[in-house]
Amino acid sequence: MTTEELYDKLKLIQKMKCETQNLELKSAEQGYPKRLYDSLSSFSNQDDGGIIVFGIDEKQDYKEVGVYDAQDIQKKINEQCLQMNPVVRPLITVVEKENKKFVSAEIPGIDLADRPCYYQGRGRLKGSYTRIGDSDEPMTEYEIYSYEAYRRKYQDDIREVPRVTLMSLDQEELNRYVELLKRGKRRLATLDNESIYELMSIKRGEKVTLSATLLFSPYPQAYFPQLCITAIVIPGRTIGSLGDMGERFSDNQRIEGTIPEMLDEALLFVKRNMRTKTIISPTTGRRTDRTDYPITAVREAIINALVHRDYSIHTEGMPIQLIMFEDRIEIHNPGGLYGRITIDQLGKIQPDTRNPVLASALETLGITENRYSGIPTIRMEMEKYNLRQPEFLDERGSFIVKLYKESKNDYEDMSNDEETNNLIVFCKTPRTRKEICDYLGLNS
């Protein structure tokens, strides 16, 4: 940044009096900070990078104390950056204000294929960090694996399942799938079934793949008990709410079977637990039945979870969660977003596919289109129902879809309240409790 930009940043810090997702503050009045590699790592591992400002003391109400030696700090910043893998290349700026010197180090986000950036002195597993609000948190083993899986193009949907044999699969369903594969594919139609099994990743060598197990096994959960859907209905708006009889769940079901079977059962669960209104048109007198949520949107959200969840060994113990609250439906999908796509880009660009073989097989079976139309369809269906637009959240190791029962007009009326709207914008960046309390002028 330029010196003018750093002066502006110092003014903003005095106004906000907090660190943020992209800002770390260090005093450095009495000497160089004991550790910096956690911030170097976490900023490098996010798209927008981050800025470290030296000369601000949080413990003295963000007082501008200045640094002990601007020249030495620059040298030590560079030394620590060289100890990172990949090496971090900071952009350093120095300014003087009221006879005190302040130093900033801009840390650029590195390419997704090069992540995680970690401190070599602690190794990849212990030296990799991610930024959560104003905190640098150690990456989980799964978060580190997810970067490696993308970089090396792991295909967990076709990993081998040792206990499953070809003959243990549902032969009728398997044969139907092979016949569907052959339609319109002249060259494929000339091959024998054994060749097709290998070519289309139904098996690898003598081992059946995970995709084939999830699609054609009579009972996939015999091998992977948690590759299922846990569906619950909460009698309130938060988990922990109790019903009139003290019940925690109004309905509770473990949904198992093949992927097509789980999709059908999940839809039945949702239909069973939402209201259907009967509307009589005042002009035509015709009757129309209207459910709380558009079924097409619910179906797309569930099939997206089943197709795009992470199927690696790190998440095979985590089921998809389908939670129906009083005011919304939430679908929690193990794995988070895959590849380079961000939340803001969902439905606008073609994403990387985490499970390409599984997605292609479900397209052949007529379960999904595999044309990246799921998110736009969900949004369009909610719009048709005049409901609030869905929310998509990418949290640590989890992707969440929220479908709201609230009408679009009611939500927009609330959103037009300037104070509420400003708070929503402020919280789009992950914030700590202290940041939110400071913003609202409350005691933490």
Predicted regions and their residues:
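Conserved N-terminal catalytic/coupling substructures associated with nucleotide/phosphate chemistry
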Residues: 1-297, 302-408, 431-437, 442
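Short alpha-helical segments that sit at the start of domains
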Residues: 405-430
